[in-house]
């Protein structure tokens, strides 16, 4: 099952949490869900060049709080905050409520699965060889502390007549291990020969505590440790648990 299911959905409530964090009764649940989908689609299309990793939506009482995780926050904020004010007004019109907008910088985009997939898609659209784009992404992720990465590209790769799937993997990607912190992202490249799909899995280490916010907290802190130091931390935690 771990090979087929979405790794993020598989770990919800264990070491991952939801991107929409609100409660509603049956009468308005559908409306709020469609608002979330509409806002995410708008942000991803409007800020395509800003490197959007994810959009987190929270709904306190009669308000809406939108947190955008971006590799280039300067493009969203704009000069003297002009662009972010326009974006806030548009989101407020969509929700018909007071909307607060937060921008969080993704410090290491090379180990963010969604941003890696988007980067490969952009390279394929510029006619970069798919093997070169995949290999470059794998090397960058491993150099910056990932313990394993797997990338698949599917479609008419290189303009071939018959569509096929190519993949590249380095290190460990334990999809069955629930305590594994695995990030997953997808993107589509609109090439002259048709659409190519990109999927990326990145293994960032293990999370031993049962904390749905652990993965997000680690990502926001930058997780500057390398694999060796993470192994030492894991061994220390296990010794402490056994003591």
Swiss-Prot record:
Query: GO annotations under biological process?
Result: translation
Q: Which GO terms describe its molecular function?
A: mRNA binding; rRNA binding; structural constituent of ribosome
Write down the superkingdom of origin. Answer: Bacteria
Q: How does it assemble?
A: Part of the 30S ribosomal subunit. Forms a tight complex with proteins S10 and S14.
Q: Which organism is it from?
A: Rhizobium johnstonii (strain DSM 114642 / LMG 32736 / 3841)
Region: Disordered, residue numbers: 214-243
- HAMAP family on file: Ribosomal_uS3_B (MF_01309_B)
Comp. bias (Basic and acidic residues): 229-243
Pfam families, sorted: KH_2 (PF07650), Ribosomal_S3_C (PF00189)
The family note in this entry says: Belongs to the universal ribosomal protein uS3 family.
Q: What does this protein do?
A: Binds the lower part of the 30S subunit head. Binds mRNA in the 70S ribosome, positioning it for translation.
**Name of the protein this chain belongs to:** Small ribosomal subunit protein uS3
Q: Which GO terms describe its cellular component?
A: cytosolic small ribosomal subunit
Per its UniProt record, what InterPro entries does this chain match? KH_dom (IPR004087), KH_dom-like_a/b (IPR015946), KH_dom_type_2 (IPR004044), KH_sf_prok-type (IPR009019), Ribosomal_S3_C_sf (IPR036419), Ribosomal_uS3_bac-typ (IPR005704), Ribosomal_uS3_C (IPR001351), Ribosomal_uS3_CS (IPR018280)
Please report the stretch or stretches of sequence annotated as the KH type-2 domain: 39-107
| Keywords from the UniProt entry | Ribonucleoprotein, Ribosomal protein, RNA-binding, rRNA-binding
Q: What is the lineage of its organism?
A: Bacteria, Pseudomonadati, Pseudomonadota, Alphaproteobacteria, Hyphomicrobiales
